[in-house]
Amino acid sequence: MGRVKLKIKKLENTNGRQSTFAKRKNGILKKANELSILCDIDIVLLMFSPTGKAAICCGTRSSMEEVIAKFSQVTPQERTKRKFESLENLKKTFQKLDHDVNIREFIASSNSTVEDLSTQARILQARISEIHGRLSYWTEPDKINNVEHLGQLEISIRQSLDQLRAHKEHFGQQQQAMQIENANFVKDWSTCSMQDGIQIPLEQQLQSMSWILNSNTTNIVTEEHNSIPQREVECSASSSFGSYPGYFGTGKSPEMTIPGQETSFLDELNTGQLKQDTSSQQQFTNNNNITAYNPNLHNDMNHHQTLPPPPLPLTLPHAQVYIPMNQREYHMNGFFEAPPPDSSAYNDNTNQTRFGSSSSSLPCSISMFDEYLFSQVTKTKLSQRF
């Protein structure tokens, strides 16, 4: 049984090509080496496996460099002639083996491949030049001399405008959504703040502040501005408070037409105490560069102006601000009328001394003192004096 005849063509299986090359490589290298020894010739055999690995066979007579240098000295015409001679010998060999192989097709296919690659390169170069020319039309549209190019440029511009409009609408929707989200966030924060008790702004909370003494410490409480700026007011039964320029007192003791020496001494004691408080307040104002103002002058047209807000109260040591030990809270009213003729200035039911003006009703502020408290103070002062 003889060997299976192998058809000379490219093997489709990669593993088959690799195995065939591995089997026949050693035989070819052996034949080349034998030919070099028997004929005493210069020979170089260079092969690459299907995987790309090189296999070289050199004769014993010369090296690879000498053979390549000798081959380079051959003219191109001689190379072509030798090539065709080799192909004819190969064709005769195939015919003896009954292999129908067209050698011309191998040569033509190789030449056509190079020509095809050259043609494709020329086509690509032409397309690149055309694209560069179209790009130049955007910067210099006056150079366009083709209606087709003008139409393509118009289409490109319209597409760009459509993309810009779509991007603008999308960006506007995103911005509007962000504004709505921010508004909802602020609303939720305000709701949470109101639920937590933060309902009055800080500026409104600082507009009504006063100092009181509580357990030998200085505290801050919210109260109307009705006590400290009005302690120098001269209260007299004959005074009418005709104008506000004389609103601030001159430091003189008030003259009151109330019978009884005890009441006069009480007023003198009270006025002295209030003057000390006012002088302490004035000293504190001057030391801290704070502008004093009267919140009850808003009804005076001559003094109606925008007053600065009160300074932020601070907790200060007792050595800087004088506060009496028997500090009481004085509530001032805005309007009082003169007592009727049949009524007495002293009311036993309420245990309070009420001072009124004999003139018409005018806006003023008058202190109301507790009789029992100041009676004890008067007795103590009298005992110390005598």
UniProtKB/Swiss-Prot annotation:
Residues 1-53 form the MADS-box domain. Residues 344-356 have a biased composition (Polar residues). The keyword Ribonucleoprotein does not apply. It comes from the Eukaryota. Residues 341-360 are annotated as: Disordered. Keywords: DNA-binding, Nucleus, Transcription, Transcription regulation. It is found in: Nucleus. Pfam families: SRF-TF. InterPro entries: MADS-box/MEF2_TF (IPR050142), SRF-like_MADS-box (IPR033897), TF_MADSbox (IPR002100), TF_MADSbox_sf (IPR036879). SUPFAM superfamilies: SRF-like. Expressed in pollen. GO terms for cellular component: nucleus. GO terms for biological process: pollen development; pollen maturation; positive regulation of transcription by RNA polymerase II; regulation of pollen tube growth. GO terms for molecular function: cis-regulatory region sequence-specific DNA binding; DNA-binding transcription factor activity; DNA-binding transcription factor activity, RNA polymerase II-specific; protein dimerization activity. Probable transcription factor that forms heterodimers with the MADS-box proteins AGL66 and AGL104 and is involved in the regulation of pollen maturation at the late stages of pollen development and pollen tube growth. Forms heterodimers with AGL66 and AGL104. This is Agamous-like MADS-box protein AGL30. The gene is AGL30.
